[in-house]
């Protein structure tokens, strides 16, 4: 056998082995997803927004409604914020809106400019029976949506409580590697993420007050809502969204920022 033929044979064997490994990982992932379906039952109410379902969780009563807004890529906003809002729901009405592609909401492949994101959030809150004005509690990237909300609809926002929220200037020097993020999305879709020990054990699981059952729910949601196409579209627009917010100036309302 010639040297070239040996190289081609070895290359074919390696490629075939990799493909079989990926197929095995994918099949295992699908089996696990089916087994975890019972854990992915919505914790809040599902409301229709533009023909798709969005998840809205409401807890507590009070004159003020605190709307918790998750950071980019947070797989389960309802559980991620639970350790905090459970301390406040005896005095305030709590609302957690899970954007498309997050938590129990549908994954949709659509543009994620600020106007679209904000329209979805406002529609979901209204469909859940919650009325403005709101106190917005954004984390990380949702800071852009909160600021834009206050700029565009000032009568709907009474205050902003930033939970380490992002501001437009944060993205001035940020280098977002979209191809790498899409590769991560592909790995999550195939199920490669299941091979990484402890990858689903977020701060909410390690340091929060979630019950053991809630931790299992979080992990199940993680493996179905990591680097979704909706999240990828959102990250692809974040620079433009930051520029839009920056061009409109600082909204004039009470703000308390925790860093």
Predicted regions mapped to residue ranges:
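Alpha/beta-hydrolase fold catalytic core
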Residues: 2-66, 90-92
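Conserved HGGG/HGGXW glycine-rich cap/lid loop of the alpha/beta-hydrolase fold
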Residues: 52-104
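Conserved serine/cysteine hydrolase catalytic core
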Residues: 210-259
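Gly/Ala-rich beta-loop-alpha elbow adjacent to hydrolase catalytic centers
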Residues: 138-142, 146
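Active-site signature of alpha/beta-hydrolase-fold catalytic machinery across serine-
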Residues: 148-152
């Amino acid at each position: 056998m010639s040297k070239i033929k040996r190289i081609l044979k070895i290359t074919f064997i390696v490629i075939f082995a990799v493909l079989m490994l990926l197929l095995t990982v994918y099949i295992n992932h699908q089996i696990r997803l089916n087994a975890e379906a019972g854990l992915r039952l919505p914790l809040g109410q599902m409301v229709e927004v533009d023909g798709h379902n969005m998840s809205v969780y409401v807890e507590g009563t009070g004159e003020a409604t605190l709307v918790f807004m998750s950071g980019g890529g947070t797989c389960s906003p309802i559980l991620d914020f639970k350790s905090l809002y459970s301390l406040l729901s005896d005095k305030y009405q709590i609302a957690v809106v899970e954007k498309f592609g997050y938590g129990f909401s549908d994954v949709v492949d659509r543009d994620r400019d600020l106007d679209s994101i904000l329209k979805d959030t406002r529609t979901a809150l209204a469909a859940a029976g919650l009325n403005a004005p709101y106190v917005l509690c954004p984390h990380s990237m949702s800071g852009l949506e909160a600021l834009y909300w206050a700029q565009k609809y000032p009568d709907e926002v009474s205050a902003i409580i930033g939970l380490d929220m992002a501001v437009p200037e944060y993205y001035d020097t940020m280098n977002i590697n979209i191809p790498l993020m899409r590769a991560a999305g592909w790995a999550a879709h195939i199920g490669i993420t299941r091979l990484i020990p402890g990858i689903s054990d977020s701060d909410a699981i390690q340091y929060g007050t979630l019950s053991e059952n809630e931790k299992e729910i979080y992990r199940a949601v993680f493996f179905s809502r990591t680097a979704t196409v909706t999240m990828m579209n959102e990250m692809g627009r974040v620079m433009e969204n930051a520029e839009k917010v920056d061009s409109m100036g600082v909204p004039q309302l009470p703000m308390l920022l925790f860093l």
